[in-house]
A protein has these predicted regions:
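Active-site SXXK
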Residues: 52-58, 76, 100-127, 168-172, ...
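Short, gly/Ser/Thr-rich active-site loops of penicillin-recognizing serine hydrolases
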Residues: 284, 305, 318-328, 385-404
């Protein structure tokens, strides 16, 4: 009996040692391959020196294999604006102040903001039925769907990764006084008016400043799993579901939107269709937002300082509408949502929330209304998970709240 217990102890010890050995080896491999010791460019207030150090360490430790841009605005003042790395590592093209990248699902926050402006102007209400503005939408049993149902992905209880943008845009065109799309409204009423360099879709002429997207390889998946075991849960939810499940059918994109093919080689990244200018220029208000971190943060700073929205509407969007337990049919996780935004419990005040929207590969937007903070983090070397479990962004977020 004692011998069996000793053998189990030895086996457990071997497994623990193997875990830490594999984790350490993989981390050192990535440091050797991707370590970038150059100092980030830009500036930061002295109060946020720890944030700047966390950003630098992401490159020093090989966690950022391409480039990244971080901007934090507090009370309308830019307190951190840093960038580093490459917009295209294959050609050694450095990330600059003007480099932009695709936002992926962080684009949804922009679509939600544009619709909130229409709510603010009295053009619609979140509780309105969609058919009030779009009668044909009501076919096939959708006649009782509200605007809020669409924004919080309650329609069929699943996350609408791509169709969210087209659904919200369809509503938007029908309530806008000029019948404009979100793309056109954003350009005419926000970007041009306030000097914000942010678009939905990108013209081929502007493509020169766009960062090239790369995907993680299998060894990077392995490293991220060993560094944070929540990652394997996320991957299992996405990849281990039956082939006829909603998650599997959504994951298997057509070739024009290939996102999830991973090469087995350590030094190579896979083909990403969203590097194609013909795809990038499409009006897809769920994923083809184009910006840098500075302009993304500036946009939402204007949203919470009263420039774009009145307090009446702000009060509606800073609190979630879905907080109870529910089974989300794609990710099988009860995300807290509301008005088109995703919410996380506030790091310092458990009665409040951060709101914004994560994006595929660690694109991040978080808004702290209590402290009048906007945090935008964008990169082109996509990570295994979203910003909610992404080590590079989470280390920055922890450093930020230790600095307040």
């Amino acid at each position: 009996m004692e011998q069996n217990g000793f053998l189990k102890f030895k086996l457990a010890l071997i497994l623990v040692l193997a875990y830490f050995t594999a984790s350490t080896i993989l981390q050192w491999l990535f440091i050797l391959q991707y370590q970038l010791s150059t100092l980030p460019k830009g500036f930061y207030d002295d109060q946020f020196e720890a944030v700047a150090e966390a950003f630098r360490q992401n490159f020093e430790k090989g966690l950022e294999r391409e480039g990244a841009h971080l901007t934090i605005i507090q009370n309308g003042k830019v307190v951190v604006n840093l960038w580093n790395g490459y917009s295209d590592s294959e050609s050694l093209r450095e990330w600059t102040q003007n480099t932009k990248t695709i936002l992926f699902s962080t684009t949804k926050a922009i679509a939600a903001l544009c619709l909130a402006i229409q709510v603010d102007r009295g053009r619609l209400s979140y509780d309105d039925l969609v058919v009030k503005y779009w009668p044909k939408y009501g076919q096939y049993g959708k006649h009782l769907t509200t605007i809020e149902d669409v924004l919080t992905h309650k329609l069929f209880h699943l996350y609408h990764a791509l169709t969210f943008g087209w659904l919200v845009d369809g509503i938007f065109r029908r309530v806008d006084e000029k019948g404009r799309s979100i793309k056109t409204f954003l350009q005419e009423e926000i970007a041009d008016k306030y000097g914000i360099g942010i678009t939905v879709g990108l013209t081929k002429q502007e493509f020169k400043n766009l960062a090239r997207i790369t995907q993680p390889g299998l060894l990077e998946y392995a490293r991220d799993i060993l560094m944070d075991l929540r990652v394997i849960t996320m991957l299992a939810i996405i990849y281990a579901q039956p082939s006829n499940s909603l998650a599997a059918r959504i994951r298997i994109h057509s070739s024009w939107l290939l996102l999830n093919f991973v090469k087995i080689y350590f030094f190579e990244n896979d083909t990403v269709a969203l590097n194609d200018p013909n795809i990038i220029e499409l009006n897809m208000p769920a994923i083809t937002g184009i910006s840098d971190a500075f302009n993304l943060a500036k946009l939402f700073s204007l949203a919470i300082d009263g420039t774009l929205l009145t307090n009446r509407t702000l009060k509606q969007i800073i609190q979630p509408t879905i907080v109870n337990w529910h089974l989300e049919k794609v990710f099988l996780y009860p995300f807290v949502k509301g008005r088109g935004f995703f919410f996380e419990k506030h790091p310092l005040n458990r009665n409040s929330y951060l709101f914004g929207h994560p994006g595929y590969g660690c694109q991040a937007l978080d808004i702290d209304f209590d402290n009048k903070l906007v945090i935008a983090y964008l990169s082109n070397g996509l990570k295994t998970g979203s910003s909610k479990i992404c080590k590079t962004y989470q280390s920055i977020l922890r450093s930020l709240y230790r600095s307040l």
